[in-house]
Swiss-Prot record:
Any Gene Ontology CC annotation: cytoplasm
Organism taxonomic ancestry: Archaea, Methanobacteriati, Methanobacteriota, Stenosarchaea group, Methanomicrobia
Free-text function comment from the UniProt entry: Catalyzes the attachment of threonine to tRNA(Thr) in a two-step reaction: L-threonine is first activated by ATP to form Thr-AMP and then transferred to the acceptor end of tRNA(Thr). Also edits incorrectly charged L-seryl-tRNA(Thr).
One of the record's GO molecular function terms: threonine-tRNA ligase activity
Subunit structure: Homodimer.
Compartment(s) of residence: Cytoplasm
EC number from the UniProt entry: 6.1.1.3
Any one of the GO BP annotations: threonyl-tRNA aminoacylation
Positions of the UniProt region annotated as Editing domain: 1-152
Keywords noted in UniProt: Aminoacyl-tRNA synthetase, ATP-binding, Cytoplasm, Ligase, Metal-binding, Nucleotide-binding, Protein biosynthesis, RNA-binding, tRNA-binding, Zinc
Name listed for the protein in its UniProt record: Threonine--tRNA ligase
Gene transcribed to yield this protein: thrS
Top-level EC class: ligase
Organism of this sequence: Methanosarcina acetivorans (strain ATCC 35395 / DSM 2834 / JCM 12185 / C2A)
Entry's cofactor comment: Binds 1 zinc ion per subunit.
Protein origin, superkingdom: Archaea
Length: 635
């Protein structure tokens, strides 16, 4: 079960139309309102069907705890399917909701909105630190266990030999410091490095199960970026116009950087023959679970990276040593991995994701090491420009012992470059196709880590795919292959930005996205209708994404809503601005919580400031109607 708990000034709803699964209700349930209440948006999930009574008991406990914290005795239970992509049957959902209502009714004033009805609702969130909380409730024994395919009525998932080997591979864990020393994890003092401590614990435990929703899940919805898609498989998302804009800007930026770096953009198929002899061998060397489908009596799998298509393309190419290093990139929309259901959450871990995947063919190991260094620096620069800095992630370096003994300087320089301790994983035996790889790992508010950028040195696949180049003597040779994702999955970049903002909010900072990624860069708020024409004039002087809040609301509410949307620049237009020709601008990046920073400048000065901030980055136009009164609500 998923709960979203909102401490509300008031919550009111009105039923509009019933769905095919709507419960029968009396007239009194067709509308409702509670003031000074805790609103519990609730999604009952399929896993709750095994023991509805346990789900009721745990939900009641969580709701009571929060009600005590916010000091309210009024509770509105509101069924909300959008909180989960794995819902229970309607019958069980109603049973659980009624059970929660009955259990709470003895101590609280409780109202329950009906299940299965389209409803108009308004909720006014109080906005204090405890006013927006989420809880994930799992029956005993399910939170940390993967769902077995046969139990879910699915085909047995395809699991590679490499993934099986990963579960049994013996790793030696060390901390590498910038001075080149390797330290035992158990004896190294991680106290000054709390995020590295969390990352080490996460990696060594290998527990990926989701126990509750991380903060970015609520943020991606409230900012109308993305949400779960109940009509698809778990781990497949929908992206609203604002989210599509952010996602496309990130995609375009990474492609621009890669092509400037010398990569050629290509496009390859989404599915491949599982029994193709070359591909089958590679499947068994890649640690991932695959989606499989049948087509024309052939068993196909959906790609989990661009390797397959690019390597098959490389096989058919005529390549000279003069062409090396040869780089190709594809923005894979989508790549697919059949991640275990219990590990899926928000944008952190998905089954369908967008991966920039670059491969570099190198003449020999010396050239591969040189390219590896360059691409390590490239990844740092890419994340820096996205808004994810060196201090925001932890570095993991993984290698075989033989490779390390021959390339210590390369490995140590990676720690020197970031100037902080890094986690090392070393193997005596090579289980995979690579001898060296690194990842930049973002550690979120729940101490869960997710890999972003990565580069790997691959010593197998040129042979496997029969990829060769003609050397200076006219003879065929095998290249060394680098795999690089300059940013990691695009969805994970959004996840990291949202999680970073959530953690900064807890530290008292004002959250925001980088200006170049903000769906609205400037919001103009006219005080009254007579100021609307001047607001339009100002908007035409701004060469950026600017919208106008023309709704019939108070100025205070308009400004607050702009703040909740993280708009970087908010311009209030009144008589003074019309008379003087300057504008009053709230600058979010310079503001503190409850202490906005304001400047009085001309529209031309504001435009120059924004153009400077977004210089060198991709640009797209406003994704929604310019006037807020013309916009629909997505969440």
């Amino acid at each position: 079960m998923q709960l979203l708990l909102i401490h509300s000034d008031y919550i009111e709803y009105e039923t509009k139309k019933q769905t095919p699964v709507a419960e029968k209700i009396e007239e009194s349930l067709k509308s409702g309102r509670l003031e000074e209440a805790l609103t519990a948006f609730t999604a009952v999930e399929s896993v709750d069907e095994a023991n509805p009574e346990e789900a009721i008991e745990k939900a009641v406990s969580e709701i009571e705890k929060v009600a005590a914290q916010v000091k309210t005795n009024r509770i509105m239970l509101y069924p909300y399917a959008h909180l989960s992509s794995d819902l229970s049957s309607p019958k069980v959902a109603v049973q659980v909701l009624k059970g929660i209502e009955a259990a709470l009714s003895g101590k609280y004033e409780v109202k329950r909105a009906p299940f299965g009805w389209y409803k108009a609702f308004t909720v006014s969130c109080k906005g204090h630190p405890l006013s927006e909380l989420s809880r994930s409730i799992h029956p005993e024994g399910t939170a940390k266990a993967a769902v077995k395919p046969e139990a879910a009525g699915e085909k047995e998932e395809v699991v590679s030999e490499a993934l099986k080997a990963e579960g049994t591979a013996r790793s030696y864990w060390r901390i590498l410091t910038p001075d080149g020393e390797l330290h035992e994890v158990e004896t190294f003092d991680l106290t000054p490095y709390p995020k590295l401590q969390q990352f080490v614990n996460y990696e060594i435990s290998k527990s990926r199960a989701v126990e509750r929703a991380p903060p970015h899940v609520e943020l991606m919805r409230r900012l109308e970026l993305a949400d779960y898609e109940p009509g698809s498989d778990s781990g497949n998302m929908r992206y609203y116009p604002k989210g599509r804009l952010v996602k496309s800007l990130l995609e375009n930026y990474v492609l621009d950087v890669a092509t400037e770096f010398g990569a050629m953009e290509v496009e390859t198929p989404l599915m491949y023959d599982m029994n193709h002899p070359t591909l089958k061998k590679y499947l068994d060397r890649f640690p991932a679970r695959q989606y499989s489908i049948e087509s024309d009596k052939r068993q196909m799998f959906l790609r989990f990276a661009a390797c397959f298509g690019q390597f098959l393309m490389n096989h058919d190419m005529t390549i000279s040593y003069k062409n090396l290093p040869l780089r190709m990139i594809e923005m894979t929309r989508y790549s697919f991995r059949k991640e275990q259901r219990g590990e899926l959450v928000g944008l952190r871990r998905l089954r369908a994701f967008t991966m920039p995947d670059m491969h570099t063919l190198c003449e020999d190991m010396n050239q591969a090491v040189s390219q590896f260094k360059e691409q390590y620096d490239l990844c740092i620069d890419v994340l820096e420009n996205v808004g994810i800095h060196i201090d925001d992630y932890e570095v993991a370096i993984r290698f075989t012992r033989d490779f390390y003994e021959s390339n210590k300087e390369l490995v140590v320089n990676m720690a020197k470059t970031v100037n902080k301790p890094v986690l090392v994983e070393m193997w005596d035996t090579r289980f995979f196709y690579f001898v060296l790889k690194f990842e930049f790992n973002f550690v979120d508010a729940l101490a869960k880590a997710s890999a972003l950028s990565t580069v790997q040195i691959d010593v197998e696949n040129a042979e496997r795919y029969d990829i060769s180049y003609v050397n200076a003597d006219g003879k065929l040779e095998r290249p060394i292959v680098l795999h690089c994702s300059p940013s990691g999955a695009i969805e994970r970049c959004i996840y990291a930005l949202l999680e970073k903002a959530a953690m900064e909010t807890e530290e008292g900072k004002v959250p925001m996205l980088p200006v170049w990624l903000s769906p609205t860069q400037v919001r103009i708020v006219p005080i009254s209708e007579k100021h609307l024409a001047f607001a339009e004039e100002v908007s035409k002087k701004l060469d950026c994404r600017v919208d106008i809040d023309d709704r019939d609301l108070s100025i205070g509410k308009k400004v607050r809503e702009a703040g909740r949307e993280w708009v970087p620049y908010v311009v209030v237009i009144g008589d003074k601005e019309m008379e003087e020709g300057t504008i009053n601008v709230t600058v979010r990046a310079e503001s503190e919580q409850n202490k906005p920073s304001k400047v009085q400048i001309t529209p031309e000065e504001l435009n120059a400031r924004i153009r400077g901030e977004i210089a060198g980055k991709p640009y797209r136009k406003l994704p929604l109607a310019k006037y807020l009164s013309a916009r629909p609500k997505f969440f």
